UniProtKB/Swiss-Prot annotation:
Monomer. [4Fe-4S] cluster 2 binds at residues 175, 179, 182. Disulfide bonds: none annotated. Residues 15-134 form the MTTase N-terminal domain. Residues 396-457 form the TRAM domain. This is tRNA-2-methylthio-N(6)-dimethylallyladenosine synthase. Keywords: 4Fe-4S, Cytoplasm, Iron, Iron-sulfur, Metal-binding, S-adenosyl-L-methionine, Transferase, tRNA processing. It comes from Bartonella henselae (strain ATCC 49882 / DSM 28221 / CCUG 30454 / Houston 1). Binds 2 [4Fe-4S] clusters. One cluster is coordinated with 3 cysteines and an exchangeable S-adenosyl-L-methionine. GO terms for cellular component: cytosol. It catalyses: N(6)-dimethylallyladenosine(37) in tRNA + (sulfur carrier)-SH + AH2 + 2 S-adenosyl-L-methionine = 2-methylsulfanyl-N(6)-dimethylallyladenosine(37) in tRNA + (sulfur carrier)-H + 5'-deoxyadenosine + L-methionine + A + S-adenosyl-L-homocysteine + 2 H(+). The lineage of its organism: Bacteria, Pseudomonadati, Pseudomonadota, Alphaproteobacteria, Hyphomicrobiales.
Length: 458
């Protein structure tokens, strides 16, 4: 009998993973890094859940009904699994902040789930998956002793190239501020800062894969601190000066910041570094000192306004975005008017605004004098009308200007490309320029939350 020729055996098809990501930019980063770590087990990313062998739901716990949204997704996945044939099994995992908060309750309510992994454990995902293949149900929500970032594999260059020329890089995680409305200290843990060496190496990997713009991430990113090779303590401003020297990198950003940690070295970086884009997301949440105190924000509105002025003096072309919560317990009409007053003074380019919703486990959830939903709705509508007016005014203010735009991807129409302005907003332009190039574009009009540009005569 002839022996089979191994060369004629078709290679095994790669396993596919689909990750549904909710929430912040850090969750996007986490999903990308989970995909990279799973490549060691033969997984490749897919954009459609129907052909996936593994589906992960990477969750966010910031807003109300986050858990309910998860269980709705899991209900649909239960039907999908039932429809699978025996030769196409489906594994289901839940990751992220709802996983951290709910833990084993997820397995109780949704037996379809094979594993539950908190944000500090996703570096163990490949090994935990192997355990589920033995029929085990896994709940891994403890805070790992080891540095999870040190155990992640290098970036997959092919995957990075597919994602585009802009990338996220987590430099700090967790929060020690304990704002009374926020679950982050409970789901992400205490503040940790990655080392300068780790950050530099990951930035180099991204640049080698074609990335031109890096956004440094952290729940409290300007709380980052580390040591340089000489043992000197660095803050975020020092790190930005350091990364700005990397060959091939064209742009830097960072988010999200706390007003308390905006120090002089960071403001100086905005003044000195052209590579640092003139855009800053600086949440304030309320303009009322009484509400800021109740939120444990640890600053007053005047301090925030003075900080805005100081940063604008350092970088006159900077655009600010913010976060606002209306209807925090005890908020009066007068408190809300203080918020409106602050918004008018700052003049934001964009902002995120929400109705307060009590998050289990936070101090805010135990407070009295909750605001009626109808009042919250009215205040939110009022606030959003003002913010939209400011956003449109900012867009119009750039008409007629020429600005450098990073070309990111093809547009909807033939010959059209979409780029990123220095102020983060997209720019649509007819051009043959390649992705990754930075070119001067004349802003001739605006669209919904974006600019319409044209090539200049260089």
């Amino acid at each position: 009998m002839n022996k089979a020729n191994p060369k004629n055996i078709p290679p095994l098809a790669p396993k596919k993973v689909f990750i549904k990501t909710y929430g912040c930019q850090m969750n996007v980063y986490d999903s990308q890094r989970m995909t990279d770590s799973l490549s060691s087990k033969g997984y490749v990313a897919t954009q459609t859940p129907n052909d996936a062998d593994l589906i992960l739901v990477n969750t966010c716990h910031i807003r109300e009904k986050a858990a309910e949204k998860l269980y709705s997704d899991l209900g649909r996945l239960r039907v999908m699994r039932q429809e699978r044939t025996p030769d196409k099994p489906l594994m289901v995992g839940v990751t992220g902040c709802v996983a951290q908060a709910e833990g084993s309750e997820i397995l109780r309510r949704a037996p379809i789930v094979d594993l539950v992994i908190g944000p500090q454990m996703y570096h163990r995902l490949p090994d935990l998956l192997e355990q589920t293949k033995q029929g085990k149900k896994i709940v891994a929500t403890e805070y790992a002793v080891e540095d999870k970032f040190a155990h992640l594999p290098p970036h997959n260059k092919r995957a990075v190239r597919k994602r585009g020329v802009s990338a996220f890089l987590t430099v700090q995680e967790g929060c020690d501020k304990f704002c009374t409305f926020c679950v982050v200290p409970y789901t992400r843990g205490a503040e940790i800062s990655r080392s300068v060496e780790q950050i530099t190496e990951e930035a180099r990997q991204l640049i080698e894969a074609g990335v031109k713009e890096i956004t440094l991430l952290g729940q409290n990113v300007n709380g980052w601190h580390g040591q340089n090779v000489n043992g000197k303590t660095w803050r975020l401003g020092d790190l930005l000066y350091h990364l700005a020297k990397l060959d091939g990198l064209k742009r830097l950003r960072y988010t999200t910041s706390h007003p308390r940690d905006m120090d002089d070295s960071l403001i100086a970086a905005h003044r000195d570094l052209d590579i640092l884009m003139p855009y800053l997301h600086l949440p304030v949440q309320s303009g009322s000192d009484r509400i800021l105190k109740a939120m444990n924000r640890q600053h007053k509105s005047i301090h925030y306004l003075q900080l805005i002025e100081k940063i604008r003096n350092a970088r006159p072309d900077i655009a600010f975005s913010g976060d606002f919560i209306v209807g925090f317990p005890g908020e009066t009409d007068e408190d809300f008017e203080e918020t409106i007053k602050l918004i008018k003074q700052v003049e934001y380019s964009s902002a995120y605004s929400f109705k307060y919703s009590p998050r289990p486990g936070t101090v805010g959830a135990t407070m009295k004098n909750h605001v009626e939903e109808a009042v919250k709705d009215a205040r939110l509508q009022h606030l959003q009308v003002l913010l939209l007016e400011q956003q449109n005014a900012f867009l119009r203010s750039k008409i007629g200007q020429t600005t450098d735009v990073l070309i990111e991807k093809a547009g909807r129409h033939s010959g059209q490309m979409v780029g990123r302005s220095p102020w983060l907003l997209p720019v649509v332009v007819d051009t043959q320029a390649s992705t990754g190039t930075v070119i001067p574009i004349h802003i001739k009009n605006t669209s919904s939350n974006s600019f319409v540009g044209e090539m200049t005569n260089m």
